[in-house]
Amino acid sequence: NQTPLKAIGHNPRRRWAPMKGQILTTLRAAETVVSGETLSQAMGVSRVTVWKHIRKLQEAGYPISAGPTGYRLTGDPDALYPWEFPGREKTLHYHPRVDSTMNVARTLARAGCPHMTVVVAGCQQRGRGRLQRVWRSTEGGLYFTIVLRPELPPVLAHRANFAASLVLARTLQKLYGVPAQVKWPNDILVA
């Protein structure tokens, strides 16, 4: 029992979306198995290309079952991959493990990455906080650094950092009911 192309909302104008994102959008919208042929026609690529992208998604932790009649997404991984954010793929960098998101962000900033580039990690091996203090960053947390290029005098830049922490904590509380607190000056702690 397969989902027909019209039922999954195929839009030929969505070619801008990365292929992994298109595959995931299609599988999430489907109520049944989606054939490789349906996916390949929707994206204008071969079934082999679809199969290769499915394999990469499986390797990244997406539980996609594959059978003789097609593919089905049975869950989602606990990760923030760039292809999950159409239009932001080039400014979101996900790493399962890094020494420090700050080190990666610094390298990207020096290379000229754009404002609001985000480096996310599943864990950090040498995470650090203010004054180079050790920051425990084990699996299961959300560790990220945002490269900002604010149009503020450097002496006021710390205010943007603190304001962002407050906004994030309040958003987690109000929209998701997550008991988040700001640990001075910019850490968000969730119980």
Question: What residue ranges belong to the model's regions?
Answer:
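N-terminal lobe of the biotin/lipoate ligase/transferase fold
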Residues: 20-174
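Short, Lys/Arg-enriched N-terminal segments with co-localized hydrophobic residues
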Residues: 8-18
